[in-house]
């Protein structure tokens, strides 16, 4: 059963994201007193009592001819066209501004059910003539931040939603269940949003030549080859030393949190600004968090044909040298804007996701362990006693984690652990997967 869709529309900083968080089942929008934080259509499941719906947060709109404003208007127009109900928000502190009047006319021409939501009303509020002149028959005064007036808003929402669509509970969500969460990460302006738009064949995310357009993590539910996918676009991650504004800090924190809860991370790298230390830092962070990763070099169409082979050789060398913990990681060269090789990226993600969830039987593990340690045994210790790894078992997946029992685990060097991990990746077909070993001392002192 299709859920009702409610769009929150208004000029910048009227409190749309605050109300979005109030109505959503879980907080998803960054809230900041700087205007224009939201730049993409942001979707979440919302709920009022027993009623469930899909909620859209939209960019703040203002009358401005620059290209960014035009692109923001396109995002909001798409949300209005999708919506069954529009909540048009204004700020009671500033009163009705010229942009509010222009936007109200813009909304009314679509002939959709709408509610005028006057936000930031911390005290008793009386609607005067200027609010009625906006042309809405339903008006509610609220404070989204403090929660006042929300019951009145809930009543209006339920009353104004079209009756021919049911909004009862137990609505089937096609993307619940075994859903692969794929986070798109990278430095600013690497083409992350362009990649997602190309993948889903929709201008879902705002793109452009400006660095840092995406400020929040945007989730998109999608299906690919009968797999439920949640694509998560994130703000570009800059070096810590260059993050000075509080909003940039919030955006970076939001992106980092998305990586922590990801299944797979696609690291997008700009071919015209190849492999910087920040790219390596992001990849290391992903591996240290135990997430699976696919590396994508975007804007490959802009690299000269005569330079591509040398580029790839140097790129692979740098990855293998600086990121040994994800040795064998999939690297794909694409052009998001031309939709070149983009499906290969998703295929690689699904493969690595499967390997990230891999469970290996104890018998196969110990057969491999015996062969590998005999081929390259640990060196003898003082007194002629050899350090031995007697037994191992897998204790978890996501990432694959193994417990190894040894007579003297503290003598097992990091280099020997790398030897075992690299050999395991090859033996069990787990290239690029972060693998974790936990050594335990055997209780029997004679082994």
Swiss-Prot record:
Entry-linked PROSITE patterns: G_ENGA
Residues where GTP 2 binds: 186-193, 233-237, 298-301
One Pfam match: KH_dom-like
GO molecular function: GTP binding
All copies of domain KH-like, residue ranges: 358-443
SUPFAM superfamilies: P-loop containing nucleoside triphosphate hydrolases
Residue numbers binding GTP 1: 10-17, 57-61, 119-122
Domain EngA-type G, first and last residues per copy: 4-165, 180-357
Keyword hit for DNA damage: no
GO BP, sorted A to Z: ribosome biogenesis
UniProtKB keywords: GTP-binding, Nucleotide-binding, Repeat, Ribosome biogenesis
Gene3D superfamilies given in the database record: 3.30.300.20, P-loop containing nucleotide triphosphate hydrolases (3.40.50.300)
Assembly description: Associates with the 50S ribosomal subunit.
Membership in a protein family: Belongs to the TRAFAC class TrmE-Era-EngA-EngB-Septin-like GTPase superfamily. EngA (Der) GTPase family.
NCBIfam families noted in UniProt: GTPase_EngA, small_GTP
Task performed by this protein: GTPase that plays an essential role in the late steps of ribosome biogenesis.
UniProt-recorded name of the protein: GTPase Der
